[in-house]
């Protein structure tokens, strides 16, 4: 019995440390973007597929997420497109498109929300401790504008509230804004 407990303990430590090691890479990739000047620009553009991206000096909130995941080897452009192609009727129809579009679908926050929901990544809970580094959060900004950001591994100066890495219009920033707008989603996405 003692031997089984030792193996179980080692397995838990290895599993936990592997999960921890993955998250900081995503946060680091997002934080790296805060060092670059990026003009907030959601203009439709034709981009390559797979691994397509708009110019690195342009982007919106979703581009912070897409670029961070891409830096750790996960191409959300492909994953979202493949799921939309197979399940187009389960995605938002607000754009009135007849089929998926690899140029823009992955850059739309409602599509990312649906993708993460379908991937089983939604997290419940709303206290500061429920938000872990690398988690994704979506908000609804004034004017019904959806927004997305990545939870940082850093905390605000006056509380245990985590900072958020996002682009709300002035380029990628790491800021204390988790509760600044109504939260519409909380996700912890890992590729299966």
Where is each model-derived feature located?
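Low-complexity, Gly/Ser/Thr/Pro-rich intrinsically disordered linker/tail segments
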Residues: 159-192
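Positively charged n-region of N-terminal signal peptides that target proteins for export
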Residues: 1-6
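...with weaker cross-activation on analogous glycine-rich loops/strands in unrelated enzymes
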Residues: 27, 85-165
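Acidic helix-start/capping segments at beta-turn-to-alpha-helix junctions
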Residues: 42-62, 75-100
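Sec-exported extracytoplasmic/periplasmic mature domains
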Residues: 31, 35, 66-74, 81, ...
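Bacterial N-terminal signal peptides
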Residues: 7-15
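Active-site-adjacent structural segments surrounding the nucleophilic cysteine of cysteine proteases
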Residues: 18-59
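Soluble non-cytosolic domains of exported or imported proteins
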Residues: 21-25, 52-63, 106, 125-128, ...
């Amino acid at each position: 019995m003692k031997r089984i407990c030792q193996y179980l303990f080692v397995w838990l430590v290895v599993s936990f440390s592997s999960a921890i090691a993955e998250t900081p890479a995503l946060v680091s990739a997002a934080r790296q973007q805060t060092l670059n000047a990026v003009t907030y620009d959601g203009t439709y553009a034709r981009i390559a597929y797979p691994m397509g991206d708009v110019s690195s000096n342009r982007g919106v909130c979703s581009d912070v997420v897409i670029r961070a995941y891409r830096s750790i080897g996960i191409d959300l452009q492909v994953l979202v497109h493949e799921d939309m192609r197979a399940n187009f009727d389960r995605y938002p129809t607000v754009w009135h498109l007849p089929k998926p579009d690899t140029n823009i679908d992955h850059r739309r926050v409602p599509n990312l929300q649906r993708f993460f929901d379908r991937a089983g990544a939604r997290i419940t809970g709303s206290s500061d401790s429920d938000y872990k580094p690398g988690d994704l959060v979506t908000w609804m900004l004034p004017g019904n504008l959806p927004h997305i950001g990545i939870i940082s591994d850093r905390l605000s100066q006056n509380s245990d509230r985590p900072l958020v890495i996002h682009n709300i219009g002035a380029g990628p920033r790491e800021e204390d804004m988790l509760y600044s707008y109504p939260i519409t989603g909380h996700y912890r996405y890992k590729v299966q």
